[in-house]
């Protein structure tokens, strides 16, 4: 069975690449992102809108609420094995994502070493200006949402009514920045929404984009890059 791995830091175009490959091969995309398993923070976690998928199949390793916490890397790895085995008759699957904890666990698990035919494509982190332009455009779309999608701010407001959700969401990029921004101004999230000015919105967009950039640099440092690069020779 063939596995095509698309990996790289946040905001580098992994989803777009996986959709194109899925359209050309007919293979499903299995997402190696633990946070995207939480359906009630779909926007803030970066899940693509169904229309963006262009009729390709995208599989998450779980379907839970953020109040249940983010799935562990160990459980995600176990579920990944099950999902891959479900699609043996497809001839191949596409793995897409940037969860360092999950990729590190996969790299240490003998299960993944010799039983599959691997190919891989790394989405490289671009220079600061290019990254920030893309990240700010992405955050601008995500922040408020539209008539068809829930915005990141709406997801954050909904989480405030559940202590477990609130505790879990404060560890996630974007949400964490907004919570700290509101706290520094002694505002609740709802109050922040009510007094939001255009300048404040721009401050949030820039701040969240910078938080994404710091996360992306951390990912670049911590990926099991040598093991991942070797997958193209197996």
Swiss-Prot record:
Alphabetical list of InterPro entries matching this protein: P-loop_NTPase, Tzs
SUPFAM superfamilies associated with the record: P-loop containing nucleoside triphosphate hydrolases (SSF52540)
Record bears the keyword Ubl conjugation: no
Top-level division of the source organism's lineage: Bacteria
Family stated for the protein in its record: Belongs to the isopentenyl transferase family.
Keywords carried by this UniProt record: Cytokinin biosynthesis, Plasmid, Transferase
Protein name, per record: Adenylate dimethylallyltransferase
Pfam family, one: IPT
Role according to the record: Transfers dimethylallyl groups to AMP as part of the biosynthesis of cytokinin phytohormones.
Enzyme Commission designation: 2.5.1.27
Catalysed transformations (reactions): dimethylallyl diphosphate + AMP = N(6)-(dimethylallyl)adenosine 5'-phosphate + diphosphate
Naturally occurring in which organism (per UniProt): Pseudomonas savastanoi (Pseudomonas syringae pv. savastanoi)
GO BP: any one term: cytokinin biosynthetic process
GO MF terms held by the record: AMP dimethylallyltransferase activity
């Amino acid at each position: 069975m063939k596995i095509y791995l698309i990996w790289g830091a946040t905001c580098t175009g992994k989803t777009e690449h996986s959709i194109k490959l899925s359209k050309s091969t007919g293979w499903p995309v299995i997402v190696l992102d633990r946070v995207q398993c939480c359906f009630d923070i779909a926007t803030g976690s970066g899940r693509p809108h169904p229309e963006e998928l262009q009729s390709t199949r995208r599989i998450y390793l779980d379907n839970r609420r953020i109040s249940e916490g983010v799935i562990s890397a160990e459980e995600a790895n176990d579920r990944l094995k099950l999902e891959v085995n479900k699609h043996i008759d497809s001839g191949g699957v596409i793995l897409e994502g940037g969860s360092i904890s999950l990729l590190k666990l996969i790299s240490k698990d003998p299960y993944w070493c010799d039983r599959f035919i691997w190919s891989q494509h790394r989405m490289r982190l671009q220079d600061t200006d290019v990254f920030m332009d893309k990240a700010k455009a992405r955050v601008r779309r995500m922040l408020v949402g539209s008539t068809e999608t829930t915005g990141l701010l709406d997801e954050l407001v909904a989480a405030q009514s559940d202590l477990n959700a609130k505790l879990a969401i404060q560890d996630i990029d974007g949400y964490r920045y907004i919570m700290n921004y509101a706290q520094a101004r002694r505002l609740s999230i709802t109050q922040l929404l009510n007094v939001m000015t255009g300048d404040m919105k721009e401050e949030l967009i820039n701040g969240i984009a910078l938080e994404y950039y710091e996360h992306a640099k951390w990912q670049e440092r911590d990926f099991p890059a040598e093991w991942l690069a070797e997958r193209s020779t197996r």
